């Protein structure tokens, strides 16, 4: 069986080159061809000797997930549904802005954490994605977007930021996610800054500590509630890793973080977590931690049981936080007409936790 070179970071490619009798510098050449150029055909790698190209073709492949569908929203947001085999699909979303282009990447087929307000969590969990399936999302998107991208003010390439906020909990797929992060940061591959790569977690504390040691990038924490009683309901992993312990892990993470703050994400649910009293409680909870609050309007999906907070409720909540001196933003809703907004990604998941096939709408249109 051929080896998929998308599964390897620089260290892995160096080891592979040694196994086929090649010197370490060949790994750097391969990294540049595969990731910087987006080349999947060994014959097109013109600075590699013919003999090496033949060895590569005999032993290896460059095989990202296959694109099932590609939809663009009215606001320019683009969503790909990618096949990862056995009837499963994952979703990747590109959000263009004037000064940056952000790619939202999935880390699992489904998610086992079952957050109450998240479409992905409702579909159950099938498996972790491989490195090739994680980095392959960036590979595909970079290739597709580069074909039509023109230099814009403030950026010279289509993808400037990565957020691991797609399907799945990244920190329960730790090794594959970290290897993918290494590729994102590698100057011979994508060359992104640690400050521009963000991992979002629901609060897997041991893995947060490991990430701080192994590959500290920007961190976002899905908080969504100002106390344990409510967070236990909305984010069930809180029963294992309660808020006070989570905040302690955040403080430890800041010792190595590329940014001097943690982002706390807070989805706004009408009548659930959006009162002024809850805003004040949230202030008391996080005021001693260098942080930014990101308020996220809830994005509806069928049978969610939740409603989006009104604009007035969001404004009142934000004002309480800002008056207390907390940096607070309200996330713009992007791509909701193609189900690409936060909390809507669901792909196509064969749930192995409940053994029930779930076919989710791929996209509108």
Swiss-Prot record:
Keyword Secreted on entry: no
Limits of the Radical SAM core domain: 97-337
Binding site for [4Fe-4S] cluster: 111, 115, 118
InterPro entries: Aldolase_TIM (IPR013785), Methyltransferase_A (IPR040072), RlmN_N (IPR048641), RNA_MTrfase_RlmN (IPR027492), rRNA_lsu_MTrfase_RlmN/Cfr (IPR004383), rSAM (IPR007197)
Main localization of the protein described in the UniProt heading: cytoplasm
SUPFAM superfamilies listed in its UniProt record: Radical SAM enzymes (SSF102114)
Details of cofactor binding: Binds 1 [4Fe-4S] cluster. The cluster is coordinated with 3 cysteines and an exchangeable S-adenosyl-L-methionine.
Record GO biological process: rRNA base methylation; tRNA methylation
First and last residue of the signal peptide: none
Intrachain S-S bonds: 104-342
Cofactor: [4Fe-4S] cluster
Keywords carried by this UniProt record: 4Fe-4S, Cytoplasm, Disulfide bond, Iron, Iron-sulfur, Metal-binding, Methyltransferase, rRNA processing, S-adenosyl-L-methionine, Transferase, tRNA processing
Entry's family note: Belongs to the radical SAM superfamily. RlmN family.
Its job: Specifically methylates position 2 of adenine 2503 in 23S rRNA and position 2 of adenine 37 in tRNAs. m2A2503 modification seems to play a crucial role in the proofreading step occurring at the peptidyl transferase center and thus would serve to optimize ribosomal fidelity.
Miscellaneous information on this protein: Reaction proceeds by a ping-pong mechanism involving intermediate methylation of a conserved cysteine residue.
Protein name in the entry: Dual-specificity RNA methyltransferase RlmN
Organism encoding this protein: Nitrosospira multiformis (strain ATCC 25196 / NCIMB 11849 / C 71)
Lineage, uppermost ranks: Bacteria, Pseudomonadati, Pseudomonadota, Betaproteobacteria, Nitrosomonadales
Gene designation: rlmN
């Amino acid at each position: 069986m051929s080896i998929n070179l998308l599964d390897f970071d620089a260290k892995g490619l160096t080891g592979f080159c040694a196994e086929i009798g090649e010197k370490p510098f060949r790994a750097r050449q391969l990294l540049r061809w595969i990731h910087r150029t987006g080349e999947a055909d060994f014959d097109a790698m013109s600075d590699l000797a013919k003999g090496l190209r033949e060895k590569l073709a005999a032993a290896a492949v460059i095989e990202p997930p296959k694109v099932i569908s590609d939809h663009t929203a009215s606001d320019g947001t683009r969503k790909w549904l990618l096949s990862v085999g056995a009837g499963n699909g994952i979703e990747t979303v590109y959000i263009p802005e004037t000064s940056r282009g952000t790619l939202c990447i999935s880390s699992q087929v489904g998610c086992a954490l079952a957050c109450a307000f998240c479409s992905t969590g409702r579909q159950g969990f099938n498996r972790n994605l491989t490195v090739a399936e994680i980095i392959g999302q960036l590979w595909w998107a970079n290739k597709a977007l580069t074909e039509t991208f023109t230099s814009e003010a403030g950026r010279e390439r289509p993808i400037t930021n990565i957020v691991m906020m797609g399907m799945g909990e990244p920190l329960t797929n730790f090794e594959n996610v970290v290897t993918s992060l290494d590729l994102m940061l590698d100057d011979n591959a994508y060359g992104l800054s640690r400050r521009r790569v963000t991992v979002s977690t629901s609060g897997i504390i041991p893995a947060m500590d490991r990430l701080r040691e192994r590959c500290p990038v920007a961190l976002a924490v899905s908080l969504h509630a100002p106390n344990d009683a409510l967070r236990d309901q909305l984010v069930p992993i809180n029963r294992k890793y309660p808020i006070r312990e989570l905040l302690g892990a955040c403080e430890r993470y800041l010792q190595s973080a590329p940014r001097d703050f943690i982002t706390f994400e807070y989805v706004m649910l009408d009548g659930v977590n959006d009162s002024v009293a809850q805003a004040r409680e949230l202030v008391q909870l996080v005021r001693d931690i260098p942080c930014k609050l990101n308020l996220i309007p809830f994005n509806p999906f069928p049978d969610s049981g939740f409603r989006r907070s009104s604009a007035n409720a969001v404004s009142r909540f934000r004002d309480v936080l800002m008056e207390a001196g907390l940096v607070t933003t309200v996330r713009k809703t992007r791509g909701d007409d193609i189900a690409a907004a936060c909390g809507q990604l669901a792909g196509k998941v064969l749930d192995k936790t409940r053994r029930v096939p779930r076919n989710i709408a791929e996209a509108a249109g």
